C-alpha cells in the first residue's frame, strides 16, 4: 500500500519526536543523575529516605527514558508515512499489576500474550492452568530481559503478583476489555469505589517500585 505523507503527518511526527526527545533529555537524564548517585552509595551510607528517593527517581527515569524512545519512534514513523502502535498507555495510573502490564511495554506483552500465553491455553483451561500460564509467561519475560538471576527473580515476583490478583479477584464475564480490578470496583458503592481506586493505585505503585 502506498504511503501518504503530507504536511499534517510530518508536523504531527515532528511534534511527537520532540515530545519523546524532551522526555529523554529533560526528565530521564536528570533523574538518572540522582539514581546513579543513590546506587553508588554503600549500604552503610544508604538510609531509608535515600533508598526511597532513589527508587522513585528510578521509577520515573525508566518510564520517561523508554516512553521517550517510543515517542521518537512513533514520531519518526509518522514523518515517513508509517503508523506504529503505541507502546505505553499511562501505566502509572493502573490500579492493579495486571492492569499495569496492559499499559507498560505493550509491544512486548502483546507478543508474549499472542505467542506464549494463548498457545499455552490462556484462561480457557481452568483456574489452576490460568494461574500457571500467567506465572510462566512472566518467568519467560524475566529471562527475556537478561540471562541473570536478578531478572529471573523479577519475573517470578511479577508472576506471583499476577497469580495472586487472578486468584483473589472475582471476575465478572468481561465487557469488552474490562480487567478484573475494574470489574470488582464497578460492583461497589460510590464511596467504596473511591477507596478501592486509591488503594489500588497505591498498591500498584508500591509493587512496581519494589519490583
Roles of regions detected by a PLM:
Residues 1-211:
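Membrane-embedded transmembrane alpha-helical bundles that form the catalytic cores
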Amino acid at each position: 500500500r502506498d504511503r501518504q505523507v503530507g504536511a499534517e503527518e510530518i508536523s504531527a511526527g515532528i511534534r511527537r519526536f520532540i515530545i519523546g526527545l524532551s522526555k529523554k533529555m529533560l526528565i530521564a537524564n536528570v533523574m538518572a543523575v540522582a539514581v546513579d548517585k543513590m546506587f553508588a552509595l554503600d549500604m552503610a551510607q544508604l538510609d531509608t529516605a535515600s533508598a526511597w528517593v532513589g527508587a522513585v527517581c528510578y521509577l520515573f527515569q525508566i518510564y520517561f527514558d523508554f516512553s521517550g524512545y517510543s515517542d521518537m519512534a512513533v514520531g519518526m514513523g509518522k514523518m515517513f508515512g508509517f503508523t506504529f502502535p503505541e507502546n505505553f498507555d499511562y501505566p502509572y495510573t493502573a490500579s492493579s499489576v495486571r492492569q499495569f502490564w496492559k499499559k507498560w511495554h505493550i509491544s512486548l506483552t502483546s507478543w508474549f500474550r499472542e505467542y506464549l500465553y494463548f498457545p499455552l491455553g490462556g484462561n480457557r483451561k481452568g483456574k489452576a492452568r490460568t494461574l500457571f500460564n500467567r506465572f510462566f509467561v512472566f518467568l519467560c519475560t524475566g529471562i527475556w530481559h537478561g540471562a541473570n538471576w536478578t531478572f529471573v527473580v523479577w519475573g517470578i515476583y511479577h508472576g506471583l503478583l499476577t497469580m495472586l490478583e487472578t486468584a483473589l479477584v472475582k471476575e465478572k464475564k468481561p465487557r469488552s476489555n474490562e480487567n478484573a480490578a475494574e470489574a470488582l470496583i464497578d460492583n461497589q458503592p460510590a464511596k467504596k469505589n473511591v477507596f478501592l481506586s486509591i488503594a489500588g493505585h497505591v498498591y500498584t505503585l508500591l509493587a512496581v517500585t519494589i519490583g
